[in-house]
């Protein structure tokens, strides 16, 4: 699945939300999150993010890896 990382915090442009064909992107208090159970890995969200915050999970930069778990926890606690 894809993961939204720190550049989204405070930005929340929402271009990705409109692009996602399966409505897997949900708004959190400070950023958007991608539901790993709904994400179909189509990558439609990645190029439309104006702050380049979206990565395929295996390509998340080392200093942003905490967002993989943060993303999972967001949906685990819903």
Swiss-Prot record:
Organism superkingdom: Bacteria
Annotated SUPFAM superfamilies: 4Fe-4S ferredoxins (SSF54862)
Protein name: Ferredoxin
Regions that span the bilayer: none
Cofactor note: Binds 1 [3Fe-4S] cluster. Binds 1 [4Fe-4S] cluster.
Cofactor: [3Fe-4S] cluster; [4Fe-4S] cluster
GO MF term set: 3 iron, 4 sulfur cluster binding; 4 iron, 4 sulfur cluster binding; electron transfer activity; metal ion binding
Keywords assigned by UniProt, alphabetized: 3Fe-4S, 4Fe-4S, Electron transport, Iron, Iron-sulfur, Metal-binding, Repeat, Transport
Residues annotated as binding [4Fe-4S] cluster: 20, 39, 42, 45
A Pfam family of this chain: Fer4_4
Role summary: Ferredoxins are iron-sulfur proteins that transfer electrons in a wide variety of metabolic reactions.
Binding site for [3Fe-4S] cluster: 8, 16, 49
Keyword RNA-binding set for record: no
Positions of the 4Fe-4S ferredoxin-type domain: 2-29, 30-59
InterPro entries in the record: 4Fe4S_Fe-S-bd, 4Fe4S_Fe_S_CS, 7Fe_ferredoxin, RnfB_subfamily
């Amino acid at each position: 699945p894809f993961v939204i990382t720190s550049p989204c915090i405070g930005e929340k442009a929402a271009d990705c939300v409109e692009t996602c064909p399966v409505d897997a992107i949900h708004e959190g208090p400070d950023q958007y999150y991608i539901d790993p159970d709904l994400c179909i890995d189509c990558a439609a969200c990645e190029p439309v993010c104006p702050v380049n915050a979206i990565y395929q999970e295996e390509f998340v930069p080392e200093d942003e890896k905490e967002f993989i778990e943060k993303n999972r926890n967001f949906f685990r606690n819903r």
